[in-house]
Regions:
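Conserved RecA-like helicase ATPase core segment
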Residues: 212-289
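Conserved Walker B
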Residues: 204-208
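Accessory N-terminal region flanking or inserted into the helicase ATPase core
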Residues: 1-4, 98-201, 236-243, 279-289
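Glycine-rich P-loop/Walker A and Walker A-like loops and their local beta1-loop-alpha1 context
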Residues: 1-48
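Conserved P-loop NTPase-based nucleic-acid remodeling module centered on helicase motor cores
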Residues: 28-144, 148
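Short glycine-/polar-rich loops that comprise or flank the Walker A/P-loop
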Residues: 27-30, 56-59, 196-197, 222-226
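Structural recognition of the conserved hydrophobic beta-strand(s) that form the central parallel beta-sheet
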Residues: 33-35, 61, 201, 225-230
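Hydrophobic helix-cap positions at the C-terminus of alpha-helices
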Residues: 20, 24, 182-185, 218-222, ...
């Protein structure tokens, strides 16, 4: 089941998440709290402050990356080597050398470390967007004057992926692999012990890239209760809306679609309307409205 907790900044979304986590912990039920990488340290501290010594052991906080590693440790794949940025740049150069005459624009840059690093970063961004080398090649055919360059980039991407399969994984591939392992476990009718009977709470995100969406989809398909807090005023989305909450509204719609695609129920969202952060300063509260 998916439930969204919606509200503006300072409306108490995170406080409500911790309240629900506490209630589950008091009932002897464990939870998982997913936050972005940069919030993992501060989240550990807040869990201890909010729940205390006895109840805090009922909660595990993860980033998507660390959760993926735990799944791989349980289901297999953790030992697969992950390439460094330097290793990924070397792989781009090797792909260029193998392509030779098939790439006219970019072959001469094969010995440029800066170009190879930039190409590796571009490939990483394409993966994050869920675009494969084949898809990029197909898209390039309708790009007019840029068709040739984009087609060559797609060939480099495809060559890179072929070499990567013989060498190791990109960091983003580990999330994809973890999602695949979780999907395979579900097909067998099993679940990693880490996820058995646990509610999942997600906070502090304003977007999810393609690998994270796949892992989130696998969690929803497992039947887990997934609660996501989003900075959204809860008003209906309007066509062409570019307002303050437009990104969150799009994300909320994507999450509801993802839940339904994976056979999960979508609960009625919780909407928090009060500005708790500025309740002692009504002037500031008026400015934020």
């Amino acid at each position: 089941m998916l439930q969204l907790i919606l509200g503006g900044s300072g409306s108490g979304k995170t406080a409500l998440l911790y309240q629900r986590i506490r209630t589950l912990a008091q009932a002897g039920k464990k939870s998982i709290l997913l936050v972005p990488e940069q919030f993992t340290s501060s989240t550990e501290g807040r869990i201890y402050r909010e729940l205390g010594d006895e109840l805090s052991v009922m909660v595990d906080s993860f980033s998507f990356t660390s959760l993926a590693e735990r799944i791989l440790s349980a289901e297999g794949g953790a030992a697969v080597r992950t390439l460094t940025d330097a290793g990924r740049a070397v792989l781009v150069r090797r792909a260029l050398e193998q392509l030779q005459d098939n790439v006219q624009y970019y072959y001469r840059h094969r010995r440029s470390a800066a170009f190879c690093q930039m190409a590796a970063q571009t490939i990483d961004e394409l993966k994050s967007a869920g675009v494969s080398g084949t898809q990029l090649y197909d898209l390039a055919q309708s790009c007019g004057p840029e068709q040739a360059k984009l087609s060559e980039l797609a060939l480099i991407y495809q060559g890179y992926e072929t070499l990567l399969a013989q060498t190791g994984m990109d960091p983003s591939d580990r999330l994809e692999l973890a999602a695949g392992r979780l999907e395979a476990a579900q097909a067998r009718g099993t679940m990693p012990e880490l996820l058995q009977g646990r509610a999942v709470f997600i906070d502090e995100f304003d977007t999810f890239n393609a690998p994270k969406k796949r892992l989130l989809g696998a969690l929803l398909a497992s039947g887990a209760s997934v609660t996501v807090a989003l900075c959204d005023d809860g008003a209906p989305a309007e066509p062409g809306d570019l307002g303050l909450f437009s990104g969150a509204k799009q994300l909320a719609a994507q999450l509801r679609s993802l839940a339904r695609k994976n056979g999960a129920e979508v609960a009625v969202p919780v909407l928090l309307r009060k500005d708790l952060r500025h309740q002692q300063a009504p002037g500031l509260a008026a400015v934020t409205r």
